[in-house]
């Protein structure tokens, strides 16, 4: 606002360099919202999404893979392709690709929707994998890798919809079945969503097992957290005063201020084959963070980093996914200042007994190869049963593990 009130002389006096010969000098009409030329200067909207670490531009009639270095685009598929793969003999199902999602890094799977229906397509195999319909108030959270089970929210409660699970004890026929996992969901009891204020790398609240039969999920009780006063301000261009007030309305948020009472989080596991849910027996959740949930390759064990609220004591623990029993503490890291786990462990595709762990214990985020000892994850507190070897080192940071080269047995 101060800059808007300044003239050209004021700008030069404050250190703005005049345009050199051949360069355009911007005016307030170019830069100020509402200026005569402002609309021509604003960058055009581009709909983009991520496919793992790859950037995809979504357009009305096609999706393009964007080279992050050069900006060059490569067409992945078009709207006509999608409709042909979905239903070659029927009317058009999808009319735009703005909402296309790529849920699995490294897999050629795209999810597109049209109204209440969502289609999952393999765009390399040119094949429809699944088709499902969501009613009003139902929001898809995550599908399993097999595309035969979907976690979704209905209101504030968590559900799972399964398809073609012939061995399911509750669904013998090849049809869909809905399981209601929770019935006490509310503004204060939150299911299947990101917890702990999105800290420690947490960005979601559901985690499918590799075999697609088990769903781990967060349950957050924030009834004890004080409301933080905020307001909902109508969008610019609001033009329906006859049906809704244009005045800001209260929209309090549950925010645990420093030193105040925090929420309590637990981790549940739903079994699609039995329809039963168990909760991990992690003890009293008061002033504790449960972060970076990961599955073992055989879908029998859940791993997570547990952290105290002071954030100076972090433990990698293991739980039996069927019973919820704690089976071991694999690793412990403490620090006088803080510990910040931000990445779940990642098992090697060629060795189900070894995984990659990321830690900043030497001052920089680096990779460590961890191998379970002869006792596996069944030891009580014997951290010596985990062999740890530092893979990277130096005064630089590992930003992300992009994947594995199984032929060369290397990490990317």
Feature-to-residue mapping (PLM):
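C-terminal segment of classical bacterial N-terminal signal peptides
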Residues: 2-10
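Beta-propeller folds
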Residues: 12-412
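Accessible peptide chain termini
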Residues: 1-2, 412
């Amino acid at each position: 606002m101060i800059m808007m009130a300044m003239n050209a002389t004021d700008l030069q006096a404050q250190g703005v360099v005049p345009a050199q010969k051949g360069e355009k000098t911007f005016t307030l009409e170019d830069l100020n919202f509402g200026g005569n030329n402002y609309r021509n200067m604003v960058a055009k909207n581009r709909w983009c999404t991520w496919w793992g670490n790859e950037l995809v531009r979504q357009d009305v009639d096609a999706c393009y893979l964007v080279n992050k270095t050069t900006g060059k685009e490569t067409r992945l598929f078009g709207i006509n392709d999608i409709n042909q793969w979905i239903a070659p003999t029927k009317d058009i199902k999808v009319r735009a690709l703005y909402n296309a999602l790529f849920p699995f890094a490294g897999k050629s799977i795209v999810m597109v929707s049209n109204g209440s229906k969502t289609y999952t397509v393999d765009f390399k195999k040119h094949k429809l994998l699944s088709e499902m319909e969501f009613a009003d108030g139902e929001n898809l959270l995550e599908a399993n890798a097999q595309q035969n089970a979907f976690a979704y929210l209905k209101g504030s409660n968590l559900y799972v919809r399964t398809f073609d699970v012939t061995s399911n004890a509750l669904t013998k026929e090849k049809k869909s079945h809905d399981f209601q996992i929770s019935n006490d969901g509310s503004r204060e009891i939150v299911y299947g969503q990101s917890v702990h204020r999105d800290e420690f790398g947490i960005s979601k609240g559901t985690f499918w097992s590799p075999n697609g039969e088990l769903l781990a999920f967060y349950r957050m009780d924030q009834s004890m957290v004080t409301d933080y006063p905020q307001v909902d301000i109508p969008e610019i261009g609001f033009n329906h005063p006859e049906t809704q007030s244009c005045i800001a309305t209260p929209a309090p948020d549950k925010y645990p201020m420093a030193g105040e009472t925090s929420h309590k989080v637990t981790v549940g596991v739903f079994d699609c084959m039995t329809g039963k849910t168990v909760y991990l027996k992690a003890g009293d959740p008061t002033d504790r963070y449960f972060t970076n949930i990961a599955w073992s390759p055989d879908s029998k064990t859940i791993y997570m980093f547990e952290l105290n609220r002071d954030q100076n004591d972090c433990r990698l623990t293991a739980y039996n996914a069927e019973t919820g029993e704690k089976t071991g503490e694999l690793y412990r890291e403490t620090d006088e200042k803080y510990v910040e786990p931000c990445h779940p462990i990642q098992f090697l595709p060629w060795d189900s007994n070894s995984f990659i762990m990321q830690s900043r214990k030497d001052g920089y985020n680096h990779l460590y190869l961890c191998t379970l000892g002869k006792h596996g994850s069944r030891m009580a507190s014997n951290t010596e049963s985990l062999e740890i070897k530092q893979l990277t080192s130096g005064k630089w940071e590992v930003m992300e593990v992009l994947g594995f080269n199984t032929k060369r047995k290397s990490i990317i």
